[in-house]
Amino acid sequence: MSTRATRPGMLHQKENAADAQAGKRQRTAAGSAARAPLSANAAPPAPDPAIEFAGRDDVDALLNEKMKGKNKMDYKGKSEQMMEYIKKLRACIKWLLEREDTNLAEIGKLNGLLEAAEKHHSEIVAQLKSAIEESKAINEELQRQYASLEENLKRVEAEKLDALRSYGDEKEARIAVEASRNEHLEDLRRIKLEEKRLNDQIKMLQDTNKRLQEYNTSLQQYNSNLQADATKNGETIAKLQKEKNTMVETMNGLKDHANSVKMQLDLAKSSQNEALKQKTDLLKEVDNLRGELQQVRDDRDHKLAEIHSLLADVSTYKEMTGKSVAELDNAMTRSTALEETCSSQAERIKTLELQLASANEKLKRSDLTTMETMTEYEKQKRMLEDLQLRLEEAEQQILDGENLRKRLHNTILELKGNIRVFCRVRPLLPNESGAVAYPKSGENLGRGIELTHNAQMYSFTFDKVFEQSASQEDVFIEISQLIQSALDGYKVCIFAYGQTGSGKTYTMMGNPELHDQKGLIPRSLEQIFQTSQALISQGWKYKMQASMLEIYNEAIRDLLATNRTTVQDGGASKYSIKHDANGNTHVSDLTIVDVSSINEVSSLLKRAAQSRSVGRTQMNEESSRSHCVFTLRIFGVNEGTDQQVQGVLNLIDLAGSERLNKSGATGDRLKETQAINKSLSCLSDVIFSIAKKEEHVPFRNSKLTYLLQPCLGGDSKTLMFVNLSPEVSSTGESICSLRFAARVNSCEIGIPRRQTQVRSLAQG
């Protein structure tokens, strides 16, 4: 049980044995340099035995520790702290070396056990084959002996006939036959025992083989469990997506209701404003009426005073002058008219007061309705905020689940060593009709694509499928982690494949002048420079070198050469491709430029774009007539840990495959088309050989495949974009591209290795 339980770990240790041995050599070199005397007269002080490290957190805490003094001039305090910090660093290095020695010893022990087990298994298989061959030989010998016995029996019968004629001869023959029979019976018994022993041995070997098969099955089950976990996470993501959709629908309903309530509130506010306006008008009118009433009252009082004055005058007149009754009646008439005017004014005042009370009542009802509407609006607003919060949580869960699925998927792909494949479909032009569809749900959502050709449906599944509506930003987000790997010390290769006019150059380069239309190459370089600047605070310093070439008619051209004549004419013969022992690719005499900012790289890309070969065909106004390869070499060193990394980023825009009957190529365009199709055919042959795991892979059949050899047959992280045209007339070519992409997706090229080492003191 313990042997089987440790075998997966042993296999894992075996896969990383090469890395462990390389790391051991690097550690030995670094360790010997680190243990070299720092001066001719003094050895470094021994690490403090009281300093202990429990794990990586303690090491990180030590590396993040900052020197603090009482003030800027406290050099003695800082020096003491620095000496204590150096002691801790020495203790940390010693602990790391001891831990690495322990790990290496354990790895060596496990490798020894694994080799012994494999050797024992080989011996058992050889013994089994030998036993089977021996058993066959024994069976043949037994058959020959049986035939011999039959012949002897016939001979004995003949001798018996002869014995009838001679008793003496019969007796001797009988004795001889009995003796021979006993010998043969003994031989037969021995043969049966030997056969039983061999059968037992065969059974034991079969049991051993069965246990090995069970162990292999357990490894396959382990891989299946990883895939099942990935599937389960996918189902969880789909469930969360469904819940998100439900919440979005609910939120949309609430938004509609909130909008309705808001409209009602706006109407209520409008009514309230109208009522307030009416109230203001009524108040103004009441004030006017009150002023008029006061004026009427004043007039009435004035008239009454006049009446009293007239009455007094009448009395006076009667008494003093004895005026006529007619004059008195006239004065009385005037007095009555004034009294009627006062009465009508009083009635109007009462009417205005009633109108004022009614307006106040309407205003109160309007205020109450407004308060109720505001309360309902606040309630709906809180509910909407709650749903919005729940929606954000669900979206975060979906995002976390998607990130987990991506990590698991990437882990599985790295364990399998497969080339990743992304599919991107360009938008339809106004005069085109589409033949592409996508799964709307299920595990293939976002990963599947369906094409209809001649009334038949073709379905394909890749690591990611981008629909026509996907932006350049959406595409780059999916590969940003892969770009980060180049800074971490990995070799990364991304190339675009597809028929002419399918959007490869737009995907890789885009329009660098417009932010929304920038392609993968400028966006990748922006991320690398931004991240490298951010890592300066952690002690990292990076040096970067850029180069760019094209393969035109099976000839290499340097796109960064300062002399454009060299680019366009026959200077390509001096460029040769070489691969070193570490899997790094070099092109002789190629222009390599040191770059330190995105602006420098942008100017290089502009210069290269002006030199690249493009031409007009019936299928594309600006068709790329060559394969373009941009390479960025990254050299990083951490001043604090002396760790060095070396990464390579290859971004490749392949020329598009095209059919002569559609492109209408003639003359130079015909020659270019033939060269492009030939190199892409060689690439297809290489992929086919890798997929079939053939011993010989024809990398040297073309410049393109030989240049891509480390990416397709080495330890690189490789991603292919297959670009498609969605129009109906291109479905045949699109299906060919998708079949090629599916074959690429199934290729296992090995687990990517990180290029890192520890810098020696001499280098420092």
UniProtKB/Swiss-Prot annotation:
Sequence ranges of Low complexity compositional bias: 29-50
Organism field: Oryza sativa subsp. japonica
Higher taxonomy: Eukaryota, Viridiplantae, Streptophyta, Embryophyta, Tracheophyta
GO biological process annotation, one example: spindle assembly
UniProt feature coiled coil, ranges: 105-416
Protein residues bound to ATP: G498, Q499, T500, G501, S502, G503, K504, T505
Transmembrane segments: none
Gene Ontology cellular component list: cytoplasm; kinesin complex; microtubule
Every Kinesin motor domain range: 418-747
Chain residue ranges for the region called Disordered: 1-50
Gene3D superfamilies registered for this protein in UniProt: Kinesin motor domain
Name of protein: Kinesin-like protein KIN-14N
Family: Belongs to the TRAFAC class myosin-kinesin ATPase superfamily. Kinesin family. KIN-14 subfamily.
Superkingdom of origin organism: Eukaryota
Gene Ontology molecular function, alphabetical: ATP binding; ATP hydrolysis activity; microtubule binding; microtubule motor activity
